[in-house]
Amino acid sequence: MGKLVYGLGNLEVEIDDRVLAHLQIVVTAKLRRNEGFMLTWTDEPSVGDGRSSIWLHQAIPLHFKYDTNEQPEINRQWLEVLTVSASNAVGMRLVEEPVKS
């Protein structure tokens, strides 16, 4: 499991390396265009089994920490789903990877 470290280390979220790689691509593209957005995910049962959201903006430090050094194969369809969701009013929701078609 990798980690998304938000802010100055105030929040660390464990995320599977494959999910994290896709998230990093979409987040980087959005922030390069100066587009802040909300990111929401479902919490693990160990932290309450609820939902969490953070505001992503280029002024807020963000660190993607991977458990392995292997680059996973990128699913372009998943990138599209994440990108579209990041552009809507409620922001990006981490969703399951769609089956490649």
Question: Language-model features: where?
Answer:
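Helix N-cap / beta->alpha transition motif
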Residues: 16, 53-57, 75
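Short, intrinsically disordered, mixed-charge
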Residues: 25-33
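Short, structured protein-protein interaction patches enriched in aromatics and acidic/basic residues
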Residues: 35-67
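Short glycine-rich, low-complexity/disordered patches
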Residues: 33-43, 92-101
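Short, surface-exposed beta-strand-loop junctions and turns on beta-sheet-rich folds
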Residues: 21-22, 46, 70
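N-terminal intrinsically disordered, cationic/polar leader segments
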Residues: 15, 22-25
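Mixed-charge, glycine-accented linear interaction segment located at domain edges/termini
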Residues: 68-101
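Short, extreme N-terminal segment that most often corresponds to the first beta-strand
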Residues: 1-16
